[in-house]
């Protein structure tokens, strides 16, 4: 097939390669004479060809203006002249000048079209690139694309390219015969383009039609499967590639290792690691980094560090992975160490893991660290990179600097779904759930589609209100948006229903999920754990392993939480001790905190202290608070005072819970002077007790109550109901437990104050506002007191209703005078 209509153009292009003879040397004039002789012999215009050489030489030296001056002054130009000048402008990014020359050309060659088309494609101006391709194919000059045109136009494709555009190019390639074996590169770029525009179905058809495939063909589809989440298919194709005799490359290992990470298949990943070692690819920087990332994503911090230390060549990716690995393990000091080391290595600052480090600052609520990182990002101009801007939004929001967060959010060059989710998440994480849901409504108005992370965040906000109606509305919206089959959205729904007290709905959503991964199982395990069903949580964990999935750190945390809530000390200890040797998971701070809670609740303080001494890090606020709470339950005043001393010495301690717990311990012992000392210390540090609130949803409206609240429109009816219930439960044997009252007042005043705690007001209001037999769900922002717990147990028996109270510790399902927690919380 004839691809060039102007044979002189081919000859002219051939002569242009003679510029290689004109390297600066003492023989320059001799070389020039030889070129001129060749030009005269072939019948070309000597002046034009010599000028073309000069233009190209000037462009090669970066002197674009001088080259353009020579070009403009040429009396006779040919297509080589203009193509050379267009190429020069394109290489310097001056596409406007290049386009002017292109539009003014009376005759264009395939080279002309390809040069300009390539610039548009490389710079993501796909509409213009494909428009030029169509114009070229329809032009009257008989200029048809060659294989270089196809391999220039297609490689830059991404999901912004219309799917039909790739199909049209494919059809033209077939028409011109470029789908045959001599042009395998064209078939390979077409295959990659179909993968990039998410048409795996067409990619698979093309793959099967390619008569003789090479390693690039296999690598392209392996990567395409992995990017689309079809991890099993990616692994199967890799095995097929090996069986067909094609040798894997560094790209092969990178793609298939990513697929293994997606499958959470640790054993298979280890096999691939071994194969990369035997084939020698493990020493390749890109493969080594992917192996490093594989171990990091499986929470194997020790293995990640060992491989990092053994790598022959470290680049910025290696440092990014090891910093992220320590961050995921909550070992922030180690992350900071490697970040400082990375700064001394001479890497381009734009490649620094600012997003990861900002996430650490957000998790630590360290505004100072966050601002330092912000300054570094500005110096590196990395704040213009969208994901760093999103991380800045997240950091400022989680440090409760919402004005700064919104300012950065508004200044982002492009507000994506991730940007909106970062801001929404910041509000939700700080307990401003209403503000988060309002932002979600605004996001919907901006015509952006919510993704799995967005839904997980708004479902969390919905769960915080315990509003089953709101949760079901979000469930319906997820169905309409086509995200129900997404495992992360499904997992978020499981979590939401569980936190709204509807474990039955949570289990149903889980069972209806078409695909389940570790996140789905973790949601179910946590749902059972939070609702006090330890046996079901442990059963779900066992089924997860039976399904072939490898448990991760979150899975173990869910089981430990279940054991803690149910008092399964021996089982909890077994799971904790099995983490490293059996499951290959390094315990994080949360796992240690859960074990301390389990041991402390059971009064096993010697074991708890031994565990704290053996931890690889210092006990933090959560751990000492857990010990203090256990001491309050078991009246261990000496250890309580030690725990309180540790807590009160923490500069960052802003939570009043530790002070309140210590006050309760002293009040129960009748040491009122020490109660006053604790309250004085609170005032001096400017720490205020968080007021107790409870809320209940009745008739699609949330009603909020505080202790001794007299502001509700139905206040008189509520008080009458409480007095009526108090009289009835007293006949059932109820005796007020005044040990939780920290005011030094007479006994009768203590009893009266207990009657009007926020959770009892909410229960009383629900009883007078809902039909008989209707279940009641009450939420509380603090831990339920022991007296209210005892009272609501008896109330559930008297009124013959299921009453659910969710506090900060767990769910309490009251029915027939019994609580699901077994009085253990």
From Swiss-Prot:
* The keyword Repeat belongs to this UniProt entry's keyword annotation: yes
Instruction: Give the keywords, sorted.
Output: Repeat
Region of interest (Type E motif), ranges: 623-699
Q: Where are the PPR repeats?
A: 47-77, 78-108, 109-143, 146-180, 183-213, 214-248, 249-283, 284-314, 315-349, 350-384, 385-415, 416-450, 451-485, 486-516, 517-551, 552-587, 588-618
What InterPro entries does UniProt report for this protein, alphabetically? Answer: DYW_dom, E_motif, Pentatricopeptide_rpt, PPR_At4g14850-like_plant, TPR-like_helical_dom_sf
Please list the GO terms describing molecular function. Answer: RNA binding; zinc ion binding
Per the record, which residues fall in region Type E(+) motif? 700-730
One GO biological process term is:
RNA modification
Query: Where in this protein does the record put region Type DYW motif?
Result: 731-825
What pairs make up the disulfide bonds? none
The source's superkingdom equals Eukaryota
* Record NCBIfam families: PPR (TIGR00756)
Q: What does the sequence similarity comment in the record state about its family?
A: Belongs to the PPR family. PCMP-H subfamily.
**Can you name this protein?**
Putative pentatricopeptide repeat-containing protein At2g01510
* Naturally occurring in which organism (per UniProt): Arabidopsis thaliana
């Amino acid at each position: 097939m004839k691809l060039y209509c102007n044979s002189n153009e081919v000859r002219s292009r051939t002569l242009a390669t003679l510029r290689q003879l004109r390297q600066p040397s003492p023989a320059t004039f001799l070389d020039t004479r030889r070129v001129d002789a060749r030009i005269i012999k072939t019948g070309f215009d000597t002046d034009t060809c010599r000028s073309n050489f000069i233009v190209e030489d000037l462009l090669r030296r970066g002197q674009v203006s001088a080259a353009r001056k020579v070009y403009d002054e040429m009396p006779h130009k040919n297509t080589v002249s203009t193509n050379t000048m267009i190429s020069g402008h394109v290489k310097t990014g001056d596409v406007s000048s290049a386009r002017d020359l292109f539009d003014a050309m009376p005759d264009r060659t395939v080279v002309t079209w390809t040069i300009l088309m390539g610039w548009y494609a490389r710079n993501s101006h796909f509409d213009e690139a494909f428009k030029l391709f169509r114009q070229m194919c329809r032009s009257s000059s008989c200029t048809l694309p060659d294989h270089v045109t196809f391999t220039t136009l297609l490689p830059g494709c991404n999901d912004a390219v219309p799917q039909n555009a790739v199909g049209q190019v494919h059809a033209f390639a077939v028409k011109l015969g470029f789908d045959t074996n001599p042009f395998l590169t064209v078939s390979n770029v077409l295959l990659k383009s179909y993968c990039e525009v998410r048409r795996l179905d067409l990619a698979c058809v093309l793959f099967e039609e390619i008569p003789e495939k090479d390693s690039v063909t296999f690598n392209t589809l392996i990567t395409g499967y992995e990017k689309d989440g079809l991890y099993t298919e990616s692994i199967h194709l890799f095995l097929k590639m090996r069986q067909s005799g094609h040798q894997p490359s560094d790209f092969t290992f990178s793609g298939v290792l990513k697929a293994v990470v997606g499958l959470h298949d640790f054993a298979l990943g280890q096999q691939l690691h071994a194969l990369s070692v035997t084939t020698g690819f493990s020493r390749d920087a890109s493969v080594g980094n992917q192996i490093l990332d594989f171990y990091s994503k499986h929470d194997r911090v020790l293995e990640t560090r060992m491989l990092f230390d053994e790598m022959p060549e470290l680049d910025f990716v290696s440092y990014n992975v090891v910093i992220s690995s320590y961050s995921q393990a909550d070992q922030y000091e180690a992350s900071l160490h490697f970040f400082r080391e990375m700064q001394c290595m001479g890497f381009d600052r734009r490649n620094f893991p600012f997003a990861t480090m900002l996430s650490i600052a957000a998790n630590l609520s360290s505004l100072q660290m966050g601002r330092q990182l912000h300054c570094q990002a500005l110096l590196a101009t990395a704040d213009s990179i969208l994901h760093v801007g999103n991380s800045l939004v997240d950091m400022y929001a989680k440090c409760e600097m919402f004005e700064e967060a919104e300012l950065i959010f508004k200044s982002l060059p492009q507000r994506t779904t991730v940007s909106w989710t970062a801001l929404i998440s910041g509000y939700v994480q700080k307990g401003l759930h209403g503000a988060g849901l309002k932002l979600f409504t605004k996001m919907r108005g901006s015509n952006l589609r919510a993704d799995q992370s967005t839904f997980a965040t708004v479902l969390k906000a919905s769960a915080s209100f315990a509003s089953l109606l709101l949760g079901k509305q979000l469930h319906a919206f997820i169905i309409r948006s086509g995200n129900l089959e997404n495992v992360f959205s499904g997992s978020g729904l499981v979590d939401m229903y569980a936190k709204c007290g509807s474990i039955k709905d949570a289990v149903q959503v889980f069972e209806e999920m078409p695909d389940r991964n570790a996140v789905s199982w973790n949601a179910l395990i946590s749902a059972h754990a939070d609702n006090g069903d330890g046996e079901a949580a442990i059963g779900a964990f066992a089924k997860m392993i039976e399904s072939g999935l490898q448990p991760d750190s979150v899975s173990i945390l869910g089981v430990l939480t279940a054991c803690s809530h149910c008092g399964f000390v021996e089982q909890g200890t077994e799971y904790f001790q099995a983490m490293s040797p059996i499951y290959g998971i390094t315990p994080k701070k949360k796992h240690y905190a859960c074990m301390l809670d389990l041991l402390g609740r059971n009064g096993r303080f010697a074991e708890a202290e031994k565990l704290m001494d053996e931890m690889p890090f210092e006990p933090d606020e959560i751990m000492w608070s857990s010990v203090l709470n256990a001491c309050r339950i078991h009246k261990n005043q000496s250890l309580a005072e030690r725990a309180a001393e540790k807590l009160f010495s923490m500069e960052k301690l802003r939570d009043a819970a530790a002070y309140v717990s210590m006050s309760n311990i002293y009040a129960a012992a009748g040491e009122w002077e020490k109660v006053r000392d604790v309250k004085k210390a609170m005032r001096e540090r400017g720490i205020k007790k968080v007021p107790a609130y409870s809320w209940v949803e009745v008739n699609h409206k949330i009603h909020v109550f505080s202790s001794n609240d007299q502001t509700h429109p139905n206040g008189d009816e509520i008080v009458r109901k409480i007095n009526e219930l108090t009289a009835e439960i007293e006949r059932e044997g109820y005796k007020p437990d005044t040990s939780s009252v920290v005011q030094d007042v007479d006994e009768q005043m203590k009893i009266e104050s207990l009657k009007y705690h926020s959770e009892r007001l909410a229960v009383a209001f629900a009883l007078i506002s809902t039909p008989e037999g209707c279940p009641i769900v009450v939420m509380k922002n603090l831990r339920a007191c022991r007296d209210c717990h005892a009272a609501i147990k008896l109330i559930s028996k008297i009124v013959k209703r299921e009453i659910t109270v969710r506090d900060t510790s767990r769910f309490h399902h009251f029915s027939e005078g019994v609580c699901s927690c077994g009085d253990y919380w």
